[in-house]
């Protein structure tokens, strides 16, 4: 089982869009059992995959979220059936993801993640790694994809500690492109602090129009910069204004009738699987 974190320190680069659609394509087109872990306190991946009313119902029925991994203190749990009741922290072995569709599973995010004290010295940043080790030993999944917050944080560190690889979505604009070097410095610092062997799976240009100068400039920079040379995926995620609207309706790229967009996500997914050694 391989674990990949999708990371970038800038919002608006289609990080979540890329992560959930690559996961869906791996599950739908390649028959892999994929677990998405939503580690972003804004839980955009969860909102793009689960309708709001279904999410509320899931919580009311006692469904588990990312908070259950990191919160080791008793807390009040609200249920439409039982009302408010004290809830003891779960053992990591007890935490079960929800089923999104055949082969695609989700450990949802939650705004409640914001209330947790993740200051240094508590060791909570290692809890995700311990959970993923349990998941790995279960044999239930072929791949775990972690959607991370767009800021350097303990959450990002937790994701990197738990991962074998990281993938960087980059929007072809000057600030995003130059920001990848800052991101690399942050990742290197985490690698050194925790003695990690995590590797870069690659860079995917997103929200791309190959006719635009900014796209050509971004491509040229990534293909010539010492560290990033050879790491750019051959295919880019195309610019489509309707993607955000469709995600608001929990529609994934493979659900659309946009053949070029579907081909792009299929090619990106295939290249990722080749890099991971999981190609068909």
Where are these regions (language model features)?
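P-loop NTP-binding core
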Residues: 1-280
